[in-house]
């Protein structure tokens, strides 16, 4: 029985980036041998065991054979006669098919080290095409390692395109699509994930609401990049610089979905695209089973991001309506998330990437002014019921009106 460190741990150590999880392959052993050593079996579909001391995963070397549709349609064979090379051959990319023995020797039958050095994402074998989830995984790796200069090998990109055209992506469950997408949104360059999916024709299958935005023009005066799809990915890239939160990044991705519904005869203008986008965000999130907090922020951003761009022109009562809609009194973090997403929208335009966004500080200060009005004082004044609400609103409007007279910020239109 021999054990080897495999997969991401070997890859990341060779890239000299932090190793998060360590996975092991066991060659030449039966399940009974591992359980006798105190290992606990956790895998249902194939033998995976937890080390009793480290709690790291140890999997018996195995092969996989396509037996049905989708990413679950595989028959697994795990036995002592399965070799390390056979186990590595079933993996998706050459950079993930490198093993390291106990003495530090690298076992690299598919030239993964060379691809690491060349910064290339390349599939191990044609078996890659049997698992549609791998299209998303490669797109995610492209996003994760984009800052290191990685690109997808042409033959791998072509195979991904063939897979997208085959209809197999339809077999992916909503949970798996969202899981890969969520990981991609957490990467340093999440916009690359969606660009890769578009390049291999998978975006229209999995995210038609986003794919539709490409080719939809916006006024060149405000959007020199013109194409709404390009603007969307630029906005996502800026959002990734501003916040690590998936909620903010997903909202940036979805902020202009409504523009995809504008009739062509009205191009390049998109009046009312905010409310139209809310329905599309709702449909997208329902289909992919996006968590409710992520969905709720994306809907708010879709509806109100244009209003935030013009915040210094809003009347006190309109500001309060915005605060109420966002439920900022109970969820103040939402306001900051919306500000960051709106800033990403304003800066996600050719030539505007480094521009300031004074609307953000203006809105932060406006909330501080309104929130400083004491609820306790209103209650202590003897008012009851709806009269408390009305008086609180009146005092907040008055405070905002007085504060607004001291403010003067330049206005840009996104």
Swiss-Prot record:
Binding, Mg(2+): 21, 23
Binding site for ATP: 8, 11, 91, 137, 140
Annotated keywords: ATP-binding, Hydrolase, Magnesium, Metal-binding, Multifunctional enzyme, Nickel, Nucleotide-binding, Nucleotidyltransferase, RNA repair, RNA-binding, Transferase, tRNA processing
Free-text comment on this protein's domains from its UniProt entry: Comprises two domains: an N-terminal domain containing the nucleotidyltransferase activity and a C-terminal HD domain associated with both phosphodiesterase and phosphatase activities.
UniProt function note: Catalyzes the addition and repair of the essential 3'-terminal CCA sequence in tRNAs without using a nucleic acid template. Adds these three nucleotides in the order of C, C, and A to the tRNA nucleotide-73, using CTP and ATP as substrates and producing inorganic pyrophosphate. tRNA 3'-terminal CCA addition is required both for tRNA processing and repair. Also involved in tRNA surveillance by mediating tandem CCA addition to generate a CCACCA at the 3' terminus of unstable tRNAs. While stable tRNAs receive only 3'-terminal CCA, unstable tRNAs are marked with CCACCA and rapidly degraded.
Family: Belongs to the tRNA nucleotidyltransferase/poly(A) polymerase family. Bacterial CCA-adding enzyme type 1 subfamily.
Protein name according to UniProt: Multifunctional CCA protein
Gene field: cca
